[in-house]
Amino acid sequence: FSWLTFIDIKIYIFPLYLSCTNLKDYTDKSVVKEYERIDFYGFLVSIVQRLMNPKSGVKRKGILVFTRFLKEAERLTMSIPGTAIVSGETPKSTREMILRQFKSGEIPVVANVGVLTTGFDYPELDTIVMARPTMSLALWYQIVGRAIRPHPNKEAGWIVDLCGNIKRFGEVKDLRLVDGGNGKWAVYSKGRQLTNVRF
């Protein structure tokens, strides 16, 4: 992968205690229960506010928050002026306007619910907040990919993981594709196979 350049990634981890069914993904019920137990909504607002006003004084080039439910996104818009929400229900023209304003810096934070994991082109983006747990390596990698793309105006990509995904999958810099023969590949992190089937 000589064509792939990884930039410095700063990672913060806040683990959650969740349950899953059929090893597919976490249940909505267990996620909501845990969010309410620890006041995840307030915690998320606090983290995003801190990211917007870093001690270094250097502003981020946009903060993209990945949420599981609309409630987290709505809490951000109520608490942080200028925050916008993008979801599957957002009309295409409105979504395009929001993303245009996000890229120009008019909108500092976009909270998105189940969208923008693929097909969103903004290489300058330097901060994502993963405010949803997942058992899906593919989803995790797609989301992380929003912040690790190199750009001349970007010194570092920040992956702020609030749900223990890094603990599950390892740091992005440790992910490796391993050829198992016959064109079958698997994803490994620190010698541990993460994908249950080779692809």
What are the functions of these language-model segments?
Residues A138-Q142, R146-L177:
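Conserved segment of the helicase C-terminal RecA-like domain
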Residues F1-L64, G183-Y188:
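Conserved interdomain linker/interface between the two RecA-like ATPase lobes of SF2 helicase motors
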Residues V109-V129, G145-R149:
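SF2 helicase motor core recognition
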